[in-house]
Every structure is written in C-alpha cells, then in structure tokens.
Design a protein with these regions (language model features):
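Donor nucleotide-sugar binding/catalytic pocket of nucleotide-sugar-dependent glycosyltransferases
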Residues: 105-143
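Conserved donor-binding/catalytic core segment of Leloir-type glycosyltransferases
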Residues: 128-181
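Nucleotide-activated donor-binding/catalytic signature segment of Leloir-type glycosyltransferases, i.e.
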Residues: 193-211
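Short alpha-helical segment that forms part of, or immediately flanks, the ligand-binding pocket
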Residues: 217, 240-245, 259-260
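A short alpha->beta transition loop at the rim of the catalytic pocket in nucleotide-sugar-dependent
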Residues: 224, 246-247
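Short hydrophobic beta-strand element within catalytic cores of glycosyltransferases
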Residues: 249-252
Length: 321
C-alpha cells in the first residue's frame, strides 16, 4: 500500500462535491477522495456548502467565492503531507506544503507542480512543462445496457464550442431522432435561439434541458450513440468516457482531449459533419462490453488515483530536496 498520507483537496466554491448536474472537476474530486480513502489515506476536502464526501469536509463560508486563501490557511489541519488544489489559489500562494495543482482548463497559472487533465492541455497550456493525469470515473456508478434504443444523444452545455448544431445536422442527415440535454448558459442564449431552437419539433429533435442523476444515466445507457462534435480543443471532455462506461458508442470530432479519450476507437472520430453522418449510416460500432472495458482499463477512478499517487510521492520527494 505504501506510505499513508494526510491529504487535502481544494475545490472551488461554486459547485458542490459531488455535483448534481454539470461539474466535471467536482466529480473528479469526489472519485479521487473516495479512492484515496479506500487505500487508507486521510483526506480533507475544502468545498462549497452542501457538499458531501467520504472524508472530512470543511465547507467554505456561505456566499463567498473570492479570497478564500485566508479561510483555508486558518482551517488547514496540522500535519498535512500534501495538497491537491483544483482551484489554483492555494497552489499559487506557494504554502510550505507540497502542492499539486490540478489544472482542468486552458488557464495559465504560475505553480510549482502543475498536473493537467490531458497531454493535450499539458502541451498547449503548459508548453510540456509539468505532468498530466486523465480524469477518471467510478465505472460501477454507470449502468451498463447492451440493448440500445433508437435515438441519438447530445449531452452538455449548449454553447457554440460544443457543436450542438452539428449534432442536429447529423440527425437530420440520417433521419435519426435526437435528444438534446443540457443547460443554456448566458453566453449560449443567442446561439440556442438561432442554431438550436428553430429545429426543435418535439418529435425528431427534442430538447429536455439539463439532466443529472438517474435521468442522465438512463439517457447515456439507452442511447444508440452519443454525438460529441466539439469545435474547439476541449481539455478533456468527460461525456465520451461516461457514455462508453455505459456501453454506448460515441462519435466525436478530433479536437483537443478527444484524441486521448477516444484513442482506442479512432474509427469513431472524424473531422467534419459528412464523415460523422457516414459513420452513423454505417452503423457498425464496437460491442458495448468492449467500450466499457476500455474505460475500466484507461479512465476509471482507480487508474486516475494510481497516477495521482505516483505524482503525490514525486511532489513530496522533490519538496524535501
């Protein structure tokens, strides 16, 4: 098992851990905390009020999102061996404790031990300096269904970079029905009204809003295929992993972290709408079991924790030099 440690995880004060709907980073913190505790480590989590975790939870003050550093310093337990900061403000403060900064987005931070969520982000944002650990999920939480229903699924925030309009065009190109599930943030309202809403007919193209919990799992596990036609270099992209954990195939545009998450199934990636339609029409996908096993082997919470543990020990060793 190795040396047992006292580990602090730092979340942002925006979304609770674990999240109800949107919140990939918070889901990572949830799974990483559980796995570290299962391995005998002591884990303390600073997170938004309303969060729930297997370890000790230290909730941030209510309605406070700025300058949380004094609160963390004041409430930091004695004897902490290492900090994993998913928010950035603790790592940038350079406290006298080994600190890994888990970087989930294309945001530049001056930290000593950066850990990016993908090799793509490490190279693009970190210029190759630092490390990367892929996100992982608790595959056992995702229902596995072999017999799929006859609908396509577009899951995620409805903004131009997620390519919801391409999912609509792909469905119209094949005649398949499409369910669009996701929230429309402020920056996506104009896009939704122009590119998405006019196509919603309640029959072939349905929009059901943001989903979470059992409803999200049911959609992911029953969909014939999940479409992920992103138009930007997304750092990681959790939806393909979640879908494949349910045994559901994904067709994705070759952008950003998709080249890593879909590395085992290059035949399901493409560069444009026409090829996406062709793949759908071909209707030849890997077996549901093969998709799920791929996630277990490469993107499970256990694999993520293995990789974090290696970097934790490396960070502690380097700090002591």
């Amino acid at each position: 098992m190795g040396l047992l440690l006292k580990i602090v995880q730092i979340a942002k004060n925006i979304i609770p851990v674990p999240p109800i709907g949107y919140g990939g980073t918070e889901r990572d913190i949830h799974y990483l905390t559980n796995c570290l505790i299962d391995r005998g480590h002591e884990v303390i989590v600073f997170a938004k009020q309303g969060s729930k975790c297997k370890g000790k939870l230290i909730p941030y003050p209510k309605n406070s999102s700025k300058n949380l550093l004094p609160f963390v310093k004041k409430n930091l337990p004695d004897g902490v061996d290492v900090i994993i900061d998913h928010a950035g403000f603790v790592a940038m403060a350079k406290l006298p404790i080994p600190t890994l900064c888990s970087i989930h987005s294309a945001y530049t931070m001056n930290v000593q031990f950066p850990v990016y969520v993908s090799k793509f982000l490490l190279e693009q944002q970190g210029n190759g300096k630092g490390y990367f650990v892929h996100n992982g999920i608790g595959v056992e939480d995702y229902p596995y269904i072999e017999k799929k229903e006859n609908f396509l699924l577009s899951l995620g925030r409805i903004i131009p970079s997620k390519g919801t309009h391409f999912a609509i065009k792909a469905a119209k190109g094949t005649g398949d029905s499409l369910i669009i599930a996701g929230n429309v943030p402020k920056k996506g309202i104009a896009y939704f009204n122009k590119e998405v809403k006019p196509h919603i007919d309640g029959e072939q193209i349905k929009y059901i809003g943001e989903v979470g919990g059992e409803e999200k799992m049911e959609l992911l596990s029953k969909a014939k295929c999940v479409l992920f036609p992103i138009t930007w270099g997304e750092p990681f992209g959790l939806v393909p992993i979640e879908a494949m954990a349910c045994g559901t195939p994904v067709i994705a545009f070759r952008k950003g972290g998709v080249l890593e998450t879909m590395n085992g199934f290059p035949e399901l990636t493409c560069n444009n709408l026409n090829v996406m339609v062709t793949i759908l029409q071909r209707n030849h996908f890997p077996s549901p079991n093969r998709l799920r096993q791929y996630v277990i082997q490469h993107f499970s919470a256990e694999v993520m924790t293995n990789n974090f543990e290696k970097l934790i020990h490396k960070a502690i060793k380097e700090y002591k030099k």
